[in-house]
Structures are given as structure tokens and as C-alpha cells.
Amino acid sequence: MANEKKFVTCDGNWAAAHIAYLFSEHAAIYPITPSSTMAEYVDEWAAQGKKNLFGEVVKVTEMQSEGGAAGAVHGSLQAGALTTTFTASQGLLLMIPNMYKIAGEMLPTVFHVSARALASHALSIFGDHQDVMACRQTGYAMLASASVQEALD
């Protein structure tokens, strides 16, 4: 019985939020669709008192903007906390100035991105990598997952 595996059916947002929660001490959030769900999970788990891998409840700070969330991540990292955030499309573009600072100072963090098309004349909400590709020059290492399992791993 000790070798019994536990399987969970979930979507990519839950998988990314679960891992982010386990490995973070602080989450700076600002809701932007389709990544809002990840931040909502983390906020809910913190409110319930769920502990991360370090035996602590993750501190969640909801900011006034995407740029504010990135700035809070930067400040938290400089203070030594393992910090994460969640974003998508235009929100990620607003984080680029802080991403340069974070990468330049070699501070360890993860930005969980729900890749989505950027707003244009067509206002597409479909999956796309324009947002992520706009950040490739910041100095961040980028990993992408092709499935929910890869997001969890």
C-alpha cells in the first residue's frame, strides 16, 4: 500500500499554482486573464493556512498593477524571499523593466505565464507566444511546458 500512487485530475493553472505555492515564500499577484486562476488558487490556499514545503504559509500581496507586482517581486527577492508571480500577455509586457533588473542582479524567481496573443486590431484571446517572445532579451531563462504534466513537473 505504501507504493500506491495518487493521481489528480487538474488543468495547467492548478498545476502551476500548486508547484508555485509549494516552492514559494511570497507571491505578488495582479489578476489578468487567463492567469488569474493561478493567483486565485494561491490566494485561497494562503487564506486557508495551507503550508508550503518549508512549513510556512505563503505571503500573498495583491498589487495595483502588473508593474507593481513585478516591482514587489523584485523587492521581495532582494530581501531574500523565494518569490513568484503569475501573468499573461499585456501584463507580462508591463513587467519587462523589472525583469531586466531581476535578471541583471541574478535573483532567482519564476514568472508563471499563461501565453496569450497580444491585443491588436483583432483582439485575439487565443494562445500565442508573442508575449513571451517579447521578453527573450531580458536575460531570463525560459522554460515552456507542452502539457499539464510538464507544468507540474
Predicted stretch roles:
Residues 1-134, 139:
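Thiamine diphosphate
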Residues 142:
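Short aromatic/hydrophobic contact patches that present stacked aromatics
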Residues 145-153:
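Structural signature of the thiamine diphosphate
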